[in-house]
């Protein structure tokens, strides 16, 4: 591409078509900015803005209160000993895997682990053993499966895995496994546990200490109303000196964080939304109630909710055999659902999906959820003769 | 910290004190957002905004034109075969080091390399050999030093280093080494070269192919008028399959990028500013002229510019013996300069520095640079009897 005026025209400011829609994509519902975060974004948008206030260590900046946020508020919020801000949950996971494991070591992942957990382990050179789930319809994860997996690794490789990970909840079905029991099983074998809380931290109460997780990863752009990429990482006292070890070349810089991570608008939007995020987490029971109400309405229409029931998270997976039937017959084929939802200003079911899809009810409230449910009902009706 | 209403009050939206000042911090001058980027920031601020348009691979998104940007515009701009967007220049460097080197391998760095190059190499488990510079006043980097360093590594470790890196320009003196000659020296030994262009890409013309660099790293928040953390990485055809290798667990995700990198406002501000960035790079001769004019005015006042002369970059290092003298005598001590500049609405010389400091003239234009130079002159005058 020659970079002339004509080709450059396609870049510059670009509108975001989905901005005004009701978005039920699980990736988006917890990442919508608060008003304070929108203001922070404009205020701190320039490149390295927070570095104007930095004496050499990002998380030691006193004003703006990054120090208080990272070293006082975050450990309290995650209920862990030490915390840092990272470039995302996957970067948090990689930092843990890369510092706790050595290439050739093993890691145990739950069978519903996010692809980024696999990729992070692969990047760290770790071999992967998965704990199977029970499959459809519950996708239940038996904590005892961790014992079996750890024993298998030990038998095959001569030593226990370096690390275990559990996804809490998983990103497909929104299942909340018994993380506390899993931590206890792992600890019986002296295997530390990393809790991937990308869909938990910032949405629902979660305590690393109560669970017994040695590490906890959260996502700012997924669940903490922040502009990404930004994440959080909590580590126990025992492992903090390893994960947050300092460079031998530069005494104040932490190796796994490459010195500095979120250094600008991202950390400032995380801080801006934090008071609201703390408050919304306290409102989690209402979110669960909304999710259950929504699931019940969907089931009344003949959709089948997969995963835990009654459900305890806003992320839900549905099977919609009737939509699949329709897609086989209508002109627009498998794109009919996406288009009919778009016409109703609803976004978030991936284009082309009909038989199976996931969605999230988080933060939408009963009124908007009602509009979504009514819209699905209308679409069913529209095609009732098909 | 108990997360109650009183403690949460310190978070939320926070003002940025330096927003209206003339900022000469080298970290800031190339990262100021364009108007288009400010608009993009607000439009695309929410968490995972671009993922609404993603079919599974970030850099394949057609609308917004991330695909065209990453696969057509960026390779042209960097003059390399393949490019990607990353979470920053240091993350670009780590991705290269981690995929090209194995723990225990060696890397050759120039003696003026940024700390993040050291930390990235350390994180990748690489041993570091540095190419010495000539020291004060020029800090000249002899390309032949790379031959010596490579030979030393080969002698000591039994094999050549996995990689060499050159900082172009360095972040202390703004020196532009003879990167083309360095590439040619490295290639004589079959050692690939990574060009750290965090202060070049987006400010001045730079061509990976003309230089002969196998890899080129750039920074969005440092030099491409983008809201960070965001960076770019260019790789030659030969090494692209290694650095951008796909996961064995997920066929579309690239391991070194952990699947996805800049997935939201950061990539959209990079794209928003891109047309202006392409244009400002064409204006580089004027920037160099401004830097030289500024340097001359500073030298007239008795400050001494260190590093290359005549200078060919906006980042400059000054020695100011007179300011040091003043700082020894005045009440405010070494903070007098910071405070006197602040009173004149100028920011960017680190608080407490007087004898040595660096600054950048980039993008400020003659008028603002005149104000800065006049202000330094006034401050000298203010203390002339001290």
Swiss-Prot record, chains A, B:
A GO molecular-function descriptor: Sep-tRNA:Cys-tRNA synthase activity
Cofactor: pyridoxal 5'-phosphate
Entry EC no(s): 2.5.1.73
Catalysed transformations (reactions): O-phospho-L-seryl-tRNA(Cys) + hydrogen sulfide + H(+) = L-cysteinyl-tRNA(Cys) + phosphate
Class of the enzyme per the UniProt entry, highest EC level: transferase
Keywords, comma-separated and alphabetical: Protein biosynthesis, Pyridoxal phosphate, Transferase
Domain of life, source organism: Archaea
Signal peptide: none
GO biological process, one term: translation
Entry-linked Pfam families: SepSecS
Binding-site residues, pyridoxal 5'-phosphate: 89-90, 196, 219-221
InterPro entries: PyrdxlP-dep_Trfase (IPR015424), PyrdxlP-dep_Trfase_major (IPR015421), PyrdxlP-dep_Trfase_small (IPR015422), Sep_Cys-tRNA_synth_arc (IPR013375), SepSecS/SepCysS (IPR008829)
Function: Converts O-phospho-L-seryl-tRNA(Cys) (Sep-tRNA(Cys)) to L-cysteinyl-tRNA(Cys) (Cys-tRNA(Cys)).
Protein name, UniProt field: O-phospho-L-seryl-tRNA:Cys-tRNA synthase
